[in-house]
């Protein structure tokens, strides 16, 4: 507890202990000067309140020794949302979340939270603020885009609202909010319509696969890695030869490439702990990889001293990791060349999972191969193809009507 006493000049000396880090009491102190003209009892009450605020500021990291601070500067409940986000929240999420997630959370905070609620004290934020935020996002004008008046999807609204909830959760943990009031169960969110996954059916996958025979060894290996093994884009780009065991026919996934705005491309651990995994591949796929490795050796010899050996499987002309956007561009051009409908590169991962399920692979195995944390994520691949649905309808009609 804070202690205080009155000096001869009428000011109060307030002391707070920060513990005994070296076996010796670590005390910090400050001075409270009551306003002139108030009674002794009022001055005593003011000193007591100030002592409580000072103690809270010390334990919450707001107090800076050697620097004069006003009462409102050390009041943990006087902090505005903008100040909390910029001074504290960003630092906390940078050590907890992935760089790409941090970038997204910051963009939502800067674009929406700070302009709308930045001047509100953290202690005054209520579920009504979150509800108004959700309602605004769900309205037609929330995109800040005159050319697109359509409202954000329900899933996107909830994703943005999660950032607001995250801010208040951290504020509660740090003592700036008395309680975590943004409980999701009391917020009315717009209806979320889950889009059906986009994947190639059997015939389209066969056209895709056969078309790869005409491509360069690197393009063939890159797209087959997505189609046959279901790796995420960042996992493909971050793959190294040391991760591959040709004798065992296995590949260890332990890193992912990423790129945030204004920063160079880098590597990080995969999306979740479940994403650190070993996947197995066929001899046919191994032959494709080995063919590419032979060509990569030739490229290295040709580049000479310009070659920057880092051990990446997929490289540019001087041995560096390829740009993370390149696989997406390669996939798009290849689909157009084959006359296939456009799928994002991630659609090859969906195709891989859907074909596994359709061909009898149990869902737990697919979950393990794909590195999903939750079985519900894997269950999206249980969605039948239109052709399978048509056969089911025909079979039922034949059974009843014949």
Question: Which residues does each PLM region occupy?
Answer:
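C-terminal secondary-structure termini that scaffold catalytic or DNA-interacting sites
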Residues: 139, 210, 248, 259-276, ...
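N-terminal core-binding DNA-recognition domain of tyrosine recombinases/integrases
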Residues: 56-71, 87-99, 110-196, 210-211
């Amino acid at each position: 507890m804070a202690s205080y006493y009155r000096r001869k000049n009428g000011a109060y000396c307030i002391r707070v202990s920060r513990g005994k880090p070296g076996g010796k009491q670590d005390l910090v102190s400050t001075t409270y000067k009551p306003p002139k003209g108030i009674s002794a009892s009022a001055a005593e009450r003011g000193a007591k309140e100030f002592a409580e605020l000072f103690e809270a500021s010390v334990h919450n990291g707001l107090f800076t020794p050697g620097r004069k601070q006003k009462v409102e500067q050390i009041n943990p409940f006087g902090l505005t949302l903008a100040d909390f986000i910029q001074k504290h929240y960003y630092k906390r999420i940078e050590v907890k979340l992935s760089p790409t997630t941090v970038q997204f959370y910051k963009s939502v905070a800067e674009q929406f939270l700070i302009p709308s609620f930045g001047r509100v004290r953290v202690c005054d934020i209520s579920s009504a603020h979150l509800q108004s935020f959700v309602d605004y996002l769900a309205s037609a004008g929330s995109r800040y885009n005159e050319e697109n008046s359509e409202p954000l999807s329900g899933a996107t609204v909830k994703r943005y609202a999660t950032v607001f909830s995250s801010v208040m959760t951290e504020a509660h943990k740090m003592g700036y909010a008395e309680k975590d009031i943004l409980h999701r169960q009391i917020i009315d969110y717009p209806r979320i319509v889950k889009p059906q996954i986009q994947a190639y059916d059997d015939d389209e996958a066969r056209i895709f696969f056969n078309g790869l025979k005409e491509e360069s060894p690197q393009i063939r290996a890159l797209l087959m890695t997505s189609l046959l093994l279901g790796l995420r884009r960042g996992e493909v780009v971050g793959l190294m030869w040391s991760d591959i065991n040709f004798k065992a026919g296995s590949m260890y996934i332990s890193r992912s490439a990423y790129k945030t705005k204004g920063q160079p491309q880098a590597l990080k651990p995969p999306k979740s702990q479940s994403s650190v995994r070993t996947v197995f591949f066929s001899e046919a796929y191994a032959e494709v990889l080995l063919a590419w490795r032979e060509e990569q050796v030739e490229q290295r010899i040709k580049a000479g001293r310009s070659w920057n050996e880092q051990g990446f499987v997929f490289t540019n002309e001087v041995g560096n990791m390829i740009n993370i956007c390149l696989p997406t561009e390669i996939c798009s051009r290849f689909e157009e060349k084959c006359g296939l409908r456009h799928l994002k590169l991630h659609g090859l991962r969906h195709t891989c999972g859907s074909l596994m399920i359709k061909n009898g692979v149990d869902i737990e195995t697919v979950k393990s191969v794909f590195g999903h944390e939750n079985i519900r994520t894997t269950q999206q691949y249980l969605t039948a193809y239109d052709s399978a649905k048509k056969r089911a309808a025909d079979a039922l009609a034949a059974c009843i009507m014949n």
